């Protein structure tokens, strides 16, 4: 199926030509409408996960819907198709490159299991990148097909507000289109932040907008930042054999449980990723060899230092894509500190018929599944007589570092701040995955903790899991926590043996007890 889609993108075969012609006609039709104004029940600005989910749901409910989407090329010139950050430069390519790194580890373990594999194995960036990029392009195509099938009008235009009901869009050829709608949803997402105070940052650095679309290996790489994007990228780059360094100004994974975050970076350090902690870059210079000389300040020593790299990747956070929307012309309020759009529980902005969902909205998790669900629920409230609001509490997530970190609910710090140390009980354990034993893999950072209320029935406030397949493990327990599970109910649950997830239902040692939290056997 993927191969067929990719083939269609490169040059459609006969069986795909009717669908291709239909899509092309739709685009030409949108462009030719520049002279007149087109009206819709719903206009969605932004073709990412949340916006597409909202548009498709509204169309399913029989409404006339349009999507306006435009990708501003990165400073490096990277651009991509329909689908937003997740599909093109986020979750999907990131997880696939993470998988490439995991496969490298499995190949190195293979001889322990009887496979005669010549060592050392070599990784080919070009092969991986082409496969990942082709899959992404197939998803771009799939989104176009879905919009066509649901009769959603797609406009490849850069949209900005004229007034609270009207948007002006300009295509890549400079042709303008006017669109109006009874309801407008802003779902433009965000883009990586550049440290503009660092000389050479824009000219010589790249971001997550670029790394997945590189045709050649990035080589020796400096990743600047301590976000999950920084650690995930550094993790898979190290995993495929590249010399990788992470430069962090302060703590890793701000907003996550800090004990778990420290274990994540400890594991990465012990498996080859180098860390420059408490350091801030000051400037980048391109050398005659085409390498990049980076100068930074070490805050601990107060001294300057330099290093040479092939690639510098900025991963210092993201900014909402609101700069060119002309929000003020529609009277839409934003947070002046971060430029995110202020919304209420209904996802409504300061203008009642204009809404914002996903990463562009203030106070919302920057996660694809929340944007998708919020978009669907919004369409159902607008057009399907529903009153169900999006519940943003206890949203699970996973950081796809080499040793994955999955979590749901409160961190230990948040629980203590909210309820007080004396009212919080934390159950925890180190464990060794069965798969690690034969290959004698290091499992010193495989760790689980469950944050609970101390008083009966000991409501589970949060679960934190560090180990293989953390996303798969956390997803199931997220349902229990969402439903108000207690510690006793988790302990009454029978585990599936032998799995890592069964260690969660065996947690019996509390931090308060002071006992050693180490699992001593696989069947105990």
Curated annotation (Swiss-Prot):
Keywords: Disulfide bond, FAD, Flavoprotein, Mitochondrion, NADP, Oxidoreductase, Redox-active center, Selenocysteine, Transit peptide. GO terms for cellular component: mitochondrion. It catalyses: [thioredoxin]-dithiol + NADP(+) = [thioredoxin]-disulfide + NADPH + H(+). One of its GO terms (molecular function) is protein homodimerization activity. Its cofactor is FAD. The modification N6-succinyllysine is found at residues 79, 175, 329. Its EC number is 1.8.1.9. InterPro entries: FAD/NAD-bd_sf, FAD/NAD-binding_dom, FAD/NAD-linked_Rdtase_dimer_sf, GSHR/TRXR-like, Pyr_nuc-diS_OxRdtase, Pyr_nucl-diS_OxRdtase_dimer, Pyr_OxRdtase_I_AS, Thioredoxin/glutathione_Rdtase. One of its GO terms (biological process) is response to oxygen radical. SUPFAM superfamilies: FAD/NAD(P)-binding domain, FAD/NAD-linked reductases, dimerisation (C-terminal) domain. FAD binds at residues 41-70. Residues 1-34 form a transit peptide. Transmembrane segments: none annotated. It is found in: Mitochondrion. There is a cross-link at residues 522-523 (Cysteinyl-selenocysteine (Cys-Sec)). The active site is at 497 (proton acceptor). It is an enzyme of class 1 (oxidoreductase). Disulfide bonds join 86-91. Expressed in liver, heart, testis and kidney. Pfam families: Pyr_redox_2 (PF07992), Pyr_redox_dim (PF02852). The active site is a redox-active disulfide bond. The selenocysteine residue is also essential for catalytic activity. Involved in the control of reactive oxygen species levels and the regulation of mitochondrial redox homeostasis. Maintains thioredoxin in a reduced state. May play a role in redox-regulated cell signaling. Homodimer. Belongs to the class-I pyridine nucleotide-disulfide oxidoreductase family. This is Thioredoxin reductase 2, mitochondrial. It comes from Mus musculus. The gene is Txnrd2.
């Amino acid at each position: 199926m993927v191969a067929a889609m990719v083939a269609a993108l490169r040059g459609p075969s006969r069986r795909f030509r009717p669908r291709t012609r239909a899509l092309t006609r739709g685009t030409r039709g949108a462009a030719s409408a520049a002279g007149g104004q087109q009206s819709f029940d719903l206009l969605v600005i932004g073709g990412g996960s949340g916006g597409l989910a909202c548009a498709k749901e509204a169309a399913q409910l029989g409404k006339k819907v349009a999507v306006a989407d435009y990708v501003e090329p990165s400073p490096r010139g990277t651009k991509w198709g329909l689908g937003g950050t997740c599909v093109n430069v986020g979750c999907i390519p990131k997880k696939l490159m993470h998988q490439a790194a995991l496969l490298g580890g499995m190949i190195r373990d293979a001889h322990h299991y009887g496979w005669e594999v010549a060592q050392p194995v070599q990784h080919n960036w070009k092969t991986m990148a082409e496969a990942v990029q082709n899959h992404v392009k197939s998803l771009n195509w799939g989104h176009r097909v879905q919009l066509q099938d649901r009769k959603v009008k797609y406009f490849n235009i850069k949209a900005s507000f004229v007034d609270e009901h009207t948007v002006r869009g300009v295509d890549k050829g400079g042709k303008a289109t006017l669109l109006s709608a009874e309801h407008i949803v802003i779902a433009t997402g965000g883009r990586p932040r550049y440290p503009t105070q660092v000389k050479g940052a824009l000219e010589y650095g790249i971001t997550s907008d670029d790394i997945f679309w590189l045709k050649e290996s990035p080589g020796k790489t400096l990743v600047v930042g301590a976000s999950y994007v920084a650690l995930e990228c550094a993790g898979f780059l190290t995993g495929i054999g590249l010399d990788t360094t992470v430069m962090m100004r302060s703590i890793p994974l701000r907003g996550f449980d800090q004990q778990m975050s420290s274990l994540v970076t400890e594991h990465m350090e012990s498996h080859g990723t180098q860390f420059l902690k408490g350091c801030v870059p000051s400037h980048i210079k391109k050398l005659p060899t085409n390498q990049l000389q980076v100068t930074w300040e070490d805050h601990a020593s107060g001294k300057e230092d330099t290093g040479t790299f092939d690639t510098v990747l900025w991963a210092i956070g993201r900014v909402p894509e609101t700069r060119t929307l002309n929000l003020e012309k529609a009277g839409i309020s934003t947070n002046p500190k971060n430029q995110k759009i202020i919304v209420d529980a209904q996802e409504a902005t300061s203008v009642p018929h204009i809404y914002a969902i996903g990463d562009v909205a203030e106070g919302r998790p920057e996660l694809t599944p929340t944007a998708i669900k919020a978009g669907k629920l919004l369409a159902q409230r607008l057009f399907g007589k529903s009153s169900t609001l999006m519940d943003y509490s206890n949203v699970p997530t996973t950081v796809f570092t080499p040793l994955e970190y999955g979590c749901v609910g409160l961190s230990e710090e948040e629980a203590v701040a909210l309820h007080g140390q004396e009212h919080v009980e934390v159950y925890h354990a180190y464990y060794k995955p069965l798969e690690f034993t034969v290959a004698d893999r290091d499992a010193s950072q495989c760790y689980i903790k469950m944050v609970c209320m101390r008083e009966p029935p000991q409501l589970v406030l949060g679960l934190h899991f560090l180990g293989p397949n953390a996303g798969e493990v956390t997803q199931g327990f997220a349902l229990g926590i969402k439903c108000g599970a207690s510690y006793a109910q988790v302990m009454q649950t029978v585990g599936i043996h032998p799995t890592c997830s069964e260690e969660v239902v065996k947690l019996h040692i509390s931090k308060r007890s002071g006992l050693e939290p180490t699992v001593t056997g696989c069947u105990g």
